[in-house]
Amino acid sequence: MKKSLLGIATSLIVLPTLSYADSPYFSFKDGDGFKRFSASIGWLHAMPQGKANNVNVNTSIAEGTTAKVGEVSKDAVLNAAVKDSNPLLYGALQLLPLETLPSGLSGTSTINGLSNWQADGTGLEADDVDTVGMMLNYHFTDHVSLEVKAGIPPKVDIKGKGDIYAPLSGSADTPLGSIDLKKDIHITDLTQGGKAASVRAWLPAAELHYQFGKSGVNKFRPYVGVGVMYAYFNDVKLNSGIESDLVAAGHMIQNIHDGQAGAALDGKTSSADPRVKVKTTDTFAPIATLGATYDFNENWFAAGSVSYSKMNNEAKISVTDNNTGKELGGVLKSMLTLNEAIIDVKES
């Protein structure tokens, strides 16, 4: 049985090789009046065209969560309380000769608005980038070729847009009465530091080209191409200021879980060890190219092209408690549209 399987496997590998050897389309020999292989190397400039999309934010605090408040500064309560919902209680809190309300007086809170929301006016945009690109072509005929293109993976700066606020709402129930809560808690400024993050981009592509004109006759030969691009991103580095802000937000969420909602309002550290992680999704996308070559002689040519590829890519920033592995919250997502302009010169 093993011998038979080996024979079948050998046949599958060898027979196609033998059959392609005599094909006019699959050969290592030059074609009739044209070269079978060509290579070019040069400048590659990528210009992302997509606009920033509002980021979605989620936390582990479900709608209607009831949590003990614990100790809390009076100023934090007054800043979050809706005065018109209970003017008498609001006035009484103002008159209390205390800077900090003890847990026996702060009571409990019912929390809404933190489970999931969209941060309006925010987003992430990739900056323009330059790198060295290489294009390899296999010519089936003088007009049809398969091109594989890639470049040295560049570092791409991701610019942030807007501020993220957490839309806290709910109510506080104290021994003195109840009062509504409503406060937009500032989480982070995505524009701080000039860039929100940096990422290394791998963007190989394969295209089928049709080239007009004829080798040896027309020096200038335009071409069109369609194919597929694969986008892979790694080595993601988040802005340190944004990372610190998200760690603080993680402490806020954990304080609510710990029955210390007042500490969350006061921005105190919690029992958690928040860590920020960034993940991006890989994606395939169609790509279209318009370009031209100019032959200087039999072996040297110049080529220039413009490619367009629309891709939808997601980036997720999560905050996890390193002590328990529990996710406290996450920020997602960014969608990018990529447009590449390519100029290259190399021996064919």
Residue positions per predicted region:
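Cleavable N-terminal export/targeting peptides
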Residues: M1-D32
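Secretion/assembly modules of Gram-negative surface proteins
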Residues: Y20-A81, A126, M134-M135
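Outer-membrane beta-barrel architecture
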Residues: D32-S40, T131-G133, S145, V199-A205, ...
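Outer-membrane beta-barrel channels and translocator barrels
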Residues: F34, T141, P153, G213-V217, ...
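Residues on the lipid-exposed face of transmembrane beta-strands in outer-membrane beta-barrel proteins
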Residues: I41, M134-D142, P204-F212, V226-Y230, ...
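A mature extracytoplasmic/lumenal domain signature
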Residues: H45, A150-I152, V306-Y308
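Extracellular/periplasm-exposed beta-strand and loop segments of Gram-negative cell-envelope proteins
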Residues: A52-T59, T66-V77, G91-D128, P154-L203, ...
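Substrate-binding/catalytic groove segments of enzymes
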Residues: G216-N218, Y294-A303, N312-I317
